[in-house]
A protein has these predicted regions:
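Short, well-ordered amphipathic alpha-helical segments that serve as non-catalytic structural scaffolds
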Residues: 254-255, 295, 299
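Short polar catalytic/cofactor-binding loops
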Residues: 280, 344-345
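Conserved small/polar residues in nucleotide/adenosyl-binding loops
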Residues: 336-344
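Catalytic alpha/beta active-site cores
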Residues: 1-279, 284-285, 303-306, 310-319
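Charged, alpha-helix-enriched surfaces in structured cytosolic catalytic cores
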Residues: 161, 291, 333
């Protein structure tokens, strides 16, 4: 069918179904057409908009075969009570087949308070492990060779301090910093707008983050120096579009600050990683991740002049959306064919 006939047929179709469509409107806050035809992709540039898997603009993934060729790191978010108790849990998880560690810190640790501080009362070891000293960090990873495991630490305000402790524990094990692999969340801007576990004002907090960028790029090249928190913003009430927009704005602020401090984008940007939400909207979530990969690649290349492929990639860790789960329907939360299973499926499909 040529273009004119297709347009004529589309016009006739829309007129015919207008009354039925009016009874079932689309979401007002989300711009999307009900029907797409070849007319919508007349100017579609395959290389620019889609490309090949593992190549710029990474729409189809940052690896050529994605999860069929390389499974994602599997790590349960874990931490509770004392360092010794959490250490036992980590060893159990690793023996059970987990391929990385994800450290949950308690709220006093997240805001830089010792466990015996009066404001810590009732919160010590409650939503994560309590880390007050280097001795606690040594106990947390006792018997776990840090050159053999990738460790993600969900910590923001005192992230630089916890990273320094981790490096010290590794050195005590005889492991050099350049052999370490892992991530610190280290995203303070989303704490101001979505969570609240900040310690210092924005400017000194940003300096700590950019200093961490520089240190890691020179000494711990395999370390992800930040995990930009789109997830927390979404869980605080943002839409799929806002999730990307606000997280990208925060990430660009970090990049601008690092460049202003004299760092080169190709040196520190490969250490930028992300944490996104996987929600229940199948097509919306798949489109979100694919669009975000392409948009971020263009921002890094065109705005910041990044030439190293890893500096252009949107490397993502995903959490399924806790906001869609309900205590009243707990059996619907976890099963493979229901909420969490469906959210995981959406991520695998993008």
């Amino acid at each position: 069918m040529d273009k004119e006939k297709l347009q004529q047929g589309l016009n006739e179709y829309e007129a015919k179904v207008a009354k039925a469509v009016a009874k079932f409107p689309e979401r007002k806050n989300f711009e999307a057409q009900r029907l797409y035809t070849p007319l919508d992709i007349e100017d579609f540039d395959y290389g620019e908009k889609l490309g090949f898997p593992g190549q710029y603009p990474f729409t189809r993934g940052v690896q050529p075969t994605m999860y069929r060729g390389r499974l994602w790191t599997m790590r349960a978010y874990a931490g509770f009570a004392t360092a010794e108790e959490t250490n036992a849990r980590y060893k159990y998880l690793l023996e059970a087949g987990q391929t990385g560690l994800s450290v949950a810190m308690d709220l006093p640790t997240q805001i830089g308070l010792d466990s015996d501080h009066e404001l810590s009362h009732g919160e010590v070891g409650k939503v994560g492990v309590a880390i007050d000293s280097l001795a606690d960090m040594e106990a947390l990873f006792d018997g776990i060779p840090l050159d053999k495991v990738s460790t993600s630490m969900t910590i923001n305000g005192p992230a630089a301090v916890l990273l320094a402790m981790y490096v010290a524990v590794a050195e005590k094990q005889g492991v050099k910093p350049d052999a370490l692999k892992g991530t610190i969340q280290n995203d303070i801007l989303k704490e101001y707008i979505a969570r609240g576990t900040y310690i210092f004002p924005p400017r000194p907090s940003m300096r700590l983050i950019t200093d961490t960028f520089e240190y890691c790029s020179k000494n711990i090249p395999k370390w992800n120096t930040i995990s930009v928190g789109a997830y927390h913003i979404r869980e605080a009430g943002a839409s799929e579009v806002q999730e990307i927009a606000f997280a990208f704005a925060n990430a660009m602020a970090y990049i601008d600050a690092a460049i202003k401090a004299g760092q080169k984008v190709d040196d520190f940007a490969p250490g930028i990683s992300w944490i996104f939400t996987a929600g229940l909207d199948f097509f919306g979530e798949v489109a979100k991740f694919r669009a975000a990969r392409r948009l971020w690649a263009r921002i890094m290349k065109e705005r910041y002049g990044a030439s190293v492929p890893k500096a252009q990639m949107l490397r993502v860790h995903v959490h399924t959306a806790g906001s869609v789960l309900t205590a009243q329907q707990h059996l619907n939360n976890r099963s493979e064919e229901r909420r969490v299973g469906k959210e995981c499926w959406r991520v695998c499909m993008c």
